[in-house]
From Swiss-Prot:
This is Small ribosomal subunit protein uS13. GO terms for molecular function: rRNA binding; structural constituent of ribosome; tRNA binding. The gene is rpsM. The keyword Ribosomal protein applies. Keywords: Ribonucleoprotein, Ribosomal protein, RNA-binding, rRNA-binding, tRNA-binding. Disulfide bonds: none annotated. It comes from Carsonella ruddii (strain PV). Belongs to the universal ribosomal protein uS13 family. Located at the top of the head of the 30S subunit, it contacts several helices of the 16S rRNA. In the 70S ribosome it contacts the 23S rRNA (bridge B1a) and protein L5 of the 50S subunit (bridge B1b), connecting the 2 subunits; these bridges are implicated in subunit movement. Contacts the tRNAs in the A and P-sites. One of its GO terms (cellular component) is cytosol. The keyword Cytoplasm does not apply. Part of the 30S ribosomal subunit. Forms a loose heterodimer with protein S19. Forms two bridges to the 50S subunit in the 70S ribosome.
Length: 118
């Protein structure tokens, strides 16, 4: 009893607003915008939708960067920041905290973790 939207399985019993939040890159406010722009789906569930309404939702979501597209964009942006050789990128490369935390007594977890630089 699942529906496939953009490669994500969502239960048909779920409310549309909350079901769309299962998709990476769509939060509660974005799902409200999607529901209000297409039609007023706020109180509907996925099992009540027709095929045309499902297609409208999918077409609207395909215009937004979600799932794998969004993940690749985030990775590319992180790689660009690493190449800038700023203070923050140097701290990332050395596997140290980069937001001003002290490292004399703390940051043991950050130092010993096996981090992959993307």
């Amino acid at each position: 009893m699942n529906i496939n939207i953009c490669g994500v399985l969502i239960s048909k019993k779920k409310n549309i607003v909350f079901g769309l939040t299962k998709i990476y890159g769509i939060g509660y406010s974005m799902s409200l915008k999607i529901c209000s722009k297409i039609e007023n789906f706020k109180n509907k569930k996925f099992k009540d939708l027709t095929n045309e309404e499902k297609a409208k939702i999918e077409n609207f979501i395909n215009k937004i960067n979600v799932e794998n597209n969004l993940k690749t964009i985030i990775k590319e942006n992180f790689k660009k920041k690493l190449n800038l050789n700023s203070y923050k990128s140097l701290r990332h490369k050395k596997k140290l905290p980069c937001r001003g935390q002290r490292t004399k007594t703390n940051a043991k977890t950050r130092k010993k973790m096996n981090h992959e630089i993307i």
